[in-house]
Design a protein with these regions (language model features):
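Basic, Lys/Arg-enriched alpha-helical interface segments
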Residues: 1-72, 83-90, 98-106
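Conserved catalytic cores of phosphodiester-cleaving nucleases, focusing on short active-site segments
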Residues: 94
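A short loop-to-beta-strand scaffold at the N-terminal edge of the catalytic core in hydrolase folds
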Residues: 74-77
Length: 106
């Protein structure tokens, strides 16, 4: 687990499990760059748009959302010190996966 502390300008500390790190390292560089961008948004923006973070209904979990073209990637997130992601100062990225899109019928 990555326990590195960001500097004080950050709103949230983001911890990364080995499973998350392994998933992200398996992705191509362009996708990894987008993951880094979304993590930066999470750490520096108080009200993170639902484009990047969405609460999973009936759970204490959230998902981080990364979109590259038509490809959708998700990472399960847990807010460590608050039930509400926005109020959380510490979050952990648990694991990621590729979400297959729905095919459009013509």
């Amino acid at each position: 687990m990555d326990l590195g502390r960001p500097n004080k300008e950050y709103i949230r500390y983001v911890f990364k499990t080995p499973e998350y790190e392994k998933f992200v390292s398996s992705l191509n560089p362009k996708v990894r760059q987008k993951f880094d961008y979304v993590v930066d948004v999470i750490t520096t923006i108080y009200n993170v748009p639902t484009k990047f973070i969405k609460h999973l209904e009936n759970t204490d979990l959230y998902e981080m959302r990364v979109s590259i073209g038509t490809n959708e990637y998700r990472t399960v997130i847990f807010a460590i010190d608050n039930h509400n992601f926005i109020e959380a100062g510490n979050v952990i990225l648990l694991n990621g996966f590729f979400e297959e899109g729905q095919q459009r019928l013509s």
